[in-house]
């Protein structure tokens, strides 16, 4: 029978009491909801007090006569009460119809028609040979008052036998027609409290009749899984793998692999793009969507309708705050591009910048219109006047923030010192390498690309280093010569890029040699720009900084072409490929092969947030055929082919960790006495110096964590889930690299620690360092043009005379047009923005406290957060050290990209847990 008894619960500062707000209506035949006599109605003390004041006697009569439901009678003689506190996150609802649906949902939950939950014990039921199960109980009652308005809290009570054992899993069935976001369930009895973290969307039973399985927070290895929930552990993993057939639906959480066959459209000649992930164009795998094919040879997937979003598993989708922030960025981008788009339409062409004030006006309210407003009184005049009229309303939308690179010194970008500094402390500080010998040699086929020796000869370099009072031999010996080399990655594409007719752009393959002076400044010595060779010429050109007006301007153009190369490689290789694309297979494999109970899953979970969604959005509108990257960056429609070529020639998992990458580039030397096992060649290398602090903190956390769960090598090799996970990453996720000998083995705790440290570094510190500086450095077009539209004029060229008359006009005419510039600036601003719901690396202790009921593990995360606080203090102190020329100086922005914390917005700082933008 039902027993009325007060039960109080308190978690996260929320006091809960149970309500008797249900009736016999809660058992509807069409759902056959079992309302058990084991479900107790619990009345608060306050309600009892009111009854007593009214002179009413409190009775224990049941609200529902259980004799009506004979199949519900308990077979248990000894029993105990277990209470479930269910926390649900509300959707942000704005429409009137949605509000009505919300109230209806509350009513349905109140009468027991919203959700059913069933406890599964860790103990085996001898009668079934499986884990003991409670009867299903409806989650009922009106929601309880909570401090956080985003959540609703409900309760359910169970009566289970004394020997039921500890609940290890909960089966959740959603009876509503819409999905429910389940935050957590807390199970309490007289002796214990067990947390079941969820943070997951529970599908409607109408979409899938299978109940969802939620496991307790305590992590355990497969071999340690309690017998009662072993079968559920495997069943849950199987449920997310899918069968590789059919189109995925929005409510599903299926993780599977596919090649990049959805970037182009073979039905449109100008949108044909190669499939990435085949022998000719190798690439990491993406998440499978199963959309229908539009062609079979090659097998290309439909891109769907323009506004239709690509599938990602339901729990990977942006939450409302993130989605609204992203939409706001797109809306702002629309307004950013509105005026130059109208100007282009009115003049029937895309307008170049003609003076630097055109660019300066981008950071003021009256952008572009002041230059492009038609003077006639017809339609053009009307539109121009109309736009001027709305400028007052949309000023904040039409105005760009001043990028950090020119905020305090408008002319810093012109100086060679700043050009060199950005190779160490800019948005792309990962390509500079130590120059160990001369001449520099190419690895390309000389029959196709000319002599392998660079034309940056010893004589040229010797002449330049003389200005610093040294010789070339001494400079090499003292490790003062450095190189940024894009020759081999770009030269195979240069002819094709320069032949693009729609939105034409021009490029070279560049090499730049730098000298690191004794006063701590890195300065460019010489630049080599190469075109494909012809029968008449090698087409290799050398430029050095000039001492007269002509060579001074030519040097500026040469540096601009280097920056254009750098911007393309940064975006397509270092940013997209090495963080976004390479991380996607790790996320897919983690969800397919590691149970949510697995300690490695729990460690990686915060570092996977939003990555699949942002990658899907990139395939939809950023890296696709005709997308922003193709429109606004040098490689154009060959962008993803270039990214594939880089994956083929240079990507190695074992070299993606920071120390290994620095050693590979010669920017650090192995030193067992150094804290991270490496010593920097340039101490004032802000990205590397700060990055090693972050790397070391991650490494220490991971090593402690791994040793906590794995005692020896045998525990690693015998973990079937772990071994399947690593095998799948190599053989499915990075299938095109599966036979490479450099893949780390997974036999020891040290192996696992190194693998996990690499992954977490890529998702957090590495992505932060090369992403959140995009607008601070790239928002000023002359500093970092993403493409150039003209080659450097030679004396025999028709453009040379114009260059001599007006070099500034020639320089600005080479930059992206106003529309191209504002397009890419808008994207860079969006990509550099922290969302209000960003989760930062320093906050891991808060995230992980929810996942663990293990004091020692919580201590590890607390120590990690404390270490990051110290690191932030250290970085701030470094940025004030006047001896560190690459961090501080007159008008120079400090290097803050690896500061752990940040407010939301475009800040140029902050390390999120994951690749979330």
Curated annotation (Swiss-Prot):
Residues 46-66, 880-904 are annotated as: Disordered. Its EC number is 1.13.11.12. PROSITE patterns: LIPOXYGENASE_1, LIPOXYGENASE_2, LIPOXYGENASE_3, PLAT. InterPro entries: LipOase, LipOase_C, LipOase_C_sf, LipOase_CS, LipOase_Fe_BS, LipOase_plant, Lipoxy_PLAT/LH2, Lipoxygenase_dom_3. Its cofactor is Fe cation. Pathway: Lipid metabolism; oxylipin biosynthesis. Keywords: Chloroplast, Dioxygenase, Fatty acid biosynthesis, Fatty acid metabolism, Iron, Lipid biosynthesis, Lipid metabolism, Metal-binding, Oxidoreductase, Oxylipin biosynthesis, Plastid, Transit peptide. Residues 219-917 form the Lipoxygenase domain. GO terms for molecular function: linoleate 13S-lipoxygenase activity; metal ion binding. Residues 98-216 form the PLAT domain. It is found in: Plastid, Chloroplast. Residues 1-40 form a transit peptide. Fe cation binds at residues 575, 580, 767, 771, 917. PANTHER family: LIPOXYGENASE (PTHR11771). Plant lipoxygenases may be involved in a number of diverse aspects of plant physiology including growth and development, pest resistance, and senescence or responses to wounding. Catalyzes the hydroperoxidation of lipids containing a cis,cis-1,4-pentadiene structure. 13S-lipoxygenase that can use linolenic acid as substrates. Belongs to the lipoxygenase family. This is Lipoxygenase 6, chloroplastic. It comes from Arabidopsis thaliana (Mouse-ear cress). The gene is LOX6.
